[in-house]
């Protein structure tokens, strides 16, 4: 006899319900509930419940709810595409940050008109209130149903497809399933291979937008066919969608590529190649300010500065493991040093040299260059080391993803006993330095072992991961898990910073490594005279100079604080006869290493002021007749406010004070507050 009731826990409360109960009945009164979490796993609202289950609701406007809704939107989009292109071959349709995409193989790239048509068809599908219905299938059944879909067949036959983040939306490790789109008459009008979960029906998709299309390689490999990828976004309400679009508009204004060109900071000449930035004088001035302050702070924290070459023999990366685990991200080798006699016979074999993708192996050689004592530990090695990563041309993006990058790279060697204290002080150092650059809103991400890509024992990984987690939790910052996100040699903490418009950027990384010291046979003499392995900590505060430059440029929308600004003072004489007085004052600032310019152009004074305002210079200094007669200058700030007739000695001291304090000044009020403190 079937069990009449079952005992479950709902929202932490024990309940006795009918055995046929699902989430549909449990949460019937709350129309914002679109799915359930059963024993910690996201499931469809109509999933049968079992005795002893723990059930929690998933609201549409929650993080999980938005992800489910966006994934349902990918199905609606794919259905709409196949209405227009019945022969379109389907790839994958995962959820991404703030949106989703689906990959298609079609004869021609999608046009803007195609995207408009697809969006209209999606609206019709949504209004038709189609239900999403899951059904489990065998592999044989799945292959039969997807006989005309080669990319789906590949996923079905790939027993490790569930490990691919994009393919994991389609394939579960446990079982295969399809989702049918069922109309009001009960007819299946479309279907897709998918693990789910999904919305109860399409009408829960209340606010969406098709954004753009682009070419993409199937499963991210340039060896695979090219697909056409359509991106979209979906939100719980139309107000949320509008707010997102407003954020995009603001982000577009702050795009570092746009600002970099407008402010003459950097460029990417075709003659050099994609992903290889050239910094112009003004951009280099910002880089120098960043590096100079970083050097100052590293000296105060007892780091030893080193410098290493840009290329090395491949054997070094054989030892480190990079050639095994990271070769696809490295540039091809250069075969050098081979010698031949007159007959072409090799008399001295050559060696493969590589552009370095990482600095850590070279720092290990510095540690290993002589015998080390416990008295030297912790040993903190630091360099601004330029490394090279082979990024695909379609994946490079401004300064945030480049092929040549300079890391503020440090490797710290310490004892196991010193490890936790070193990590704690290091995290404090990182956060304080980022705050000095104007970033103040952080959370931490803990990246753990990828079971298919790691070196060393499970025990070592567990100890390293637990230590990092303990240090992260003691910081009192939010800690988010990043499963399988670690590099092959150790777990890491990433500092995620939110910028002025709420976007999240990964900046600093702190990685704990027991494995490379083992691979390089690093040792120190302990207090008892025994030879011991040091613990190694990899650390980059900026991540890379280029990426951090881009983050700051967008965070400040080009209006850097005075200490970072490419031009700190711009002089504008009211007329030519006042230029000598202004030049004399500017010279006194330049003697104090202030970055200054004077507008000697033939433009009218009003145009000079407009041009100066567009340049986002923190201090515009104006000199007219009254200023000259009183040995004074007048300030104009970014918001248009002014301070007139400031004596030159006072003005010079105040400018130097604001620069030294590293505070942001956009107005006369900001300026007065900064110099008064």
From Swiss-Prot:
EC numbers on record: 6.1.1.3
Region described as Catalytic: spans on this chain: 255-561
Keywords: Aminoacyl-tRNA synthetase, ATP-binding, Cytoplasm, Ligase, Metal-binding, Nucleotide-binding, Protein biosynthesis, RNA-binding, tRNA-binding, Zinc
Catalytic activity: tRNA(Thr) + L-threonine + ATP = L-threonyl-tRNA(Thr) + AMP + diphosphate + H(+)
GO MF annotation: an example: threonine-tRNA ligase activity
Keyword Chloroplast listed: no
SMART domains: tRNA_SAD (SM00863)
Co-factor requirement: Zn(2+)
TGS domain mapped to chain residues: 1-59
GO biological process: threonyl-tRNA aminoacylation
Cofactor note as given: Binds 1 zinc ion per subunit.
Residues the record lists as binding Zn(2+): 360, 411, 538
GO CC terms, sorted: cytoplasm
Compartment(s): Cytoplasm
The keyword Ion transport is assigned to this record: no
Function: Catalyzes the attachment of threonine to tRNA(Thr) in a two-step reaction: L-threonine is first activated by ATP to form Thr-AMP and then transferred to the acceptor end of tRNA(Thr). Also edits incorrectly charged L-seryl-tRNA(Thr).
Description of how the protein assembles with itself and partners: Homodimer.
Protein family according to the UniProt entry: Belongs to the class-II aminoacyl-tRNA synthetase family.
Protein name: Threonine--tRNA ligase
The species this protein was found in: Bifidobacterium longum (strain DJO10A)
